[in-house]
Structure formats: structure tokens, C-alpha cells
Amino acid sequence: MNRLCGGLVATITVLAMAGCGSSGLVTPTTVSVVSAEELTLGADAYRQFCSDCHGEDVRGTDKGPSFLSQVYEPNHHADAAFQLAVQRGSPQHHWNFGDMPPVEGIAPDELEAIVTYVRGVQAELGFID
């Protein structure tokens, strides 16, 4: 777990630094600082609420899709789409797993941390920039 959090923090740091071009000009970049505590909360909440269907490694199961699909890139499914799917459920539309029911019992800070965790894993695996 510590290795994953360290890797995610390092990935986020590298992504923040990627805005510097060779011309010496800095390209404006929005960077959010993610604490180790938030990543831990996200990982723990993901395991508790999401991993049965989406896999311990975000690669999916026979019950739900992988988050390493172009469907889940930020420009296709924004963070808000993840949050709404958890809160309201989601009708089957990309996969043949059936409808996703709303997930009960997730606190707002846990939900935000889950999305941050999933995006961090996607970045660490080279799935998103």
C-alpha cells in the first residue's frame, strides 16, 4: 500500500512538472495536491465498495468493467460521471454487466477519494497522462 501511495504521489509530481517546456516558458497546468491520507482513504474505500465488481487492481471482474478502458478516460467519463454513477446508479450502456445499482454507505469524502485513487492508478499504469 505504501509503495502504491508513493508511486501515485510521484506520478502526480511528474505530471505537474510536465508542464515545463524546453523553451523555458511554463505552460499553465492545473495541479491538485493529493495527500497520502487521501490516497489511503481512496484505496481503502475502493476495496470496500468497488473492488468486488471492478477488481482489486481496477481491471474489472465478471461482474463489472475495468477502469482501464478508453470509456473511463477523463475526457469521456469525467470525475463527476463516476460520482453520479455511484450515487444514482447507472443503466447498462457500454458493457453487458447489467445496470449498476447505486452504492449505499459511501461518505462524500470517501467518494472523492475513490475517484482520486482510480485516476491515480490509471496514471501510474500509463493509461492517462
Where are the model-predicted features located?
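Secreted/luminal cysteine- and crosslink-motif detector
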Residues: 6, 21, 51-54
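Electrostatic cytochrome c docking/interface patches
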Residues: 21-45, 129
